[in-house]
Amino acid sequence: MCLHAKGQQLSCLALKEPVSIIASDRVIKKLDMSILSRVREWVRITRGSRMETSCLELALEGERQCKVGDYRAGVSFFESAIQVGTEDLQILSAIYSQLGNAYFHLREYSKALEYHRHDLNLTRTCGDELGEAKASGNLGNTLKVLGRFDEAVVCCQRHYDITRGMYDKVGQARALYNFGNVYHAKGKSICWTGAEPGEIPEEAKVALNKATEYYEFNLSIVKDLGDRPAQGRTYGNLGNTHYLLGNFQRAVVAHGQRLLIAKEFGDMAAERRAYCNLGNAYIFLGQFEVAAEHYKRTLQLAMLLTDKAVEAQACYSLGNTYTLQQDYQTAIDYHLKHLIIAQELKDRVGEGRACWSLGNAHTALGNHQKAIHFAEKHLVISKEVLVYCYWATLYSSRSNACYQYLSSSHSAFCWTSEELHGNNLLIIIQ
């Protein structure tokens, strides 16, 4: 018995439709629980084949586990559902898609890629163009994370072509957003060498400029659709991209829009990111007092959200901003706060940067004994980190193991794009 033949194809549509690429880089959109309840009720009252019911119920339980954030358990249920088997290819396609999404959340990207490929092949076999579009989007996002940008672009193009052919404006907007994310990630990967914003290789500029074009195209559609949350996400990524390109005034405009939309929805986390990003842009525009005000608002929101890592980042940024203004005593106050939080978080890289900054500030004030004290602490931490990096590099198959350790610092330099919870760029003065 095919479940999608009953209840106006309720079961397969309920499983398939929500697995769309939403306007974020987190590729899973979980199933609507009211629809799941209807599916469960349908299964309960329908006398179907035992195989179909068991497979579906295992898949539903897997979805429920993912809903509460237990993706490992979700994977177990989905894989059990596949082992039980189903004759309904659309249900199988949905399970493949959910498995790919669950593995994506677990950061097991090779497995995610495997199941999204299965889903893509199955949707093509079924002649399900809408499913193929969504599978292409999921596959593209996974390839992007793996750094396989050219392949990701092909998937995004297929996603866009299908949705355009179906006059699906929502799907087109998502495909364009994904396009922008791929080119943004490609550009960032090329210039990820500690270079100043704007001072990046030409190849990176080309990719980032393409990203801005796709984000602008996406904005034109989501504005027509009246989708304010999608507009907010795109403005955030557009601002991040302009920042990397050195277009700081444009970054301010984009992040200003992001801030307005975040306030509109009471999204304090997005509001905090927007304030931080605005502070970063104003630093490069030379408007240090304005930057400081935005960082202070970032700090206030971080404290409200009880996010100690972001609180540390904000203190570090404020310390550096006051150093630029030559207000060294205020800079010391903020760097001390950064140091205390870094110690609480056991963040040795953050501690080292705080000590370095404190040493510089005390030197500027002529407090030579304190400057020496913090310089010595910085030296001890630096040696410790270098030893760790040596062993990490020696025993790791990755050549960038040392870099990964340094960039994992809670309260030091942290960059993530809007679709992965936004940008916490810090202005590092060393």
Predicted feature locations:
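Structural signature of alpha-solenoid helical repeat scaffolds
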Residues: 49-50, 87, 127, 167, ...
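Eukaryotic all-alpha helical interaction scaffolds
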Residues: 65, 83-85, 103, 123, ...
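Alpha-helical segment of the N-proximal tetratricopeptide repeat
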Residues: 54-83, 101-107, 188, 199-202
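Conserved alpha-helical positions within TPR/SEL1-like repeat arrays
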Residues: 56-67, 91-105, 131-145, 171-185, ...
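Repeat-mediated protein-protein interaction surfaces in helical alpha-solenoids
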Residues: 30-47, 72-83, 118-121, 217-220
